[in-house]
Amino acid sequence: MSNVPSELKYVASHEWLRLEDDGTVTVGITDHAQEALGDIVYVELPDVGDTVAVDDEVAVVESVKAASDVYAPLTGEVVAINEALEDDPEVINTDPYGEGWMYRIKPDNADDFESLLSAEEYQAEL
């Protein structure tokens, strides 16, 4: 059974989101997604300053099994990326909700965060 922390929000395409104190949102892939992918060997992240819209392809995660696109769950500006993933992408496998975060976005509309899936709603999608 995949770990689905209750304090996070989710989208059906298997990304998790955490609202930070400064109003930005940290995004990564879920435990379910990393389990399905297997050992992650490469991550392509967006550039800081990129503007993304909901459902835009924003990153790529490659594993020994497949390459998988990561889609933007919110519209906004990318304000930070997890550069550590470039040298150590497998941290997504070992700590998907912590050190394995992928990027941080400043959403255009803060209310959009509240409309995302709760942990219970996401688990029902699995």
Curated annotation (Swiss-Prot):
GO terms for biological process: glycine decarboxylation via glycine cleavage system. Keywords: Lipoyl. InterPro entries: 2-oxoA_DH_lipoyl-BS, Biotin_lipoyl, GCV_H, GCV_H/Fam206, GCV_H_sub, Single_hybrid_motif. Binds 1 lipoyl cofactor covalently. Its cofactor is (R)-lipoate. GO terms for cellular component: cytosol; glycine cleavage complex. Residues 24-106 form the Lipoyl-binding domain. The modification N6-lipoyllysine is found at residue 65. Belongs to the GcvH family. The glycine cleavage system is composed of four proteins: P, T, L and H. HAMAP family: GcvH. NCBIfam families: gcvH, PRK01202.1. The glycine cleavage system catalyzes the degradation of glycine. The H protein shuttles the methylamine group of glycine from the P protein to the T protein. This is Glycine cleavage system H protein. It comes from Psychrobacter sp. (strain PRwf-1). The gene is gcvH.
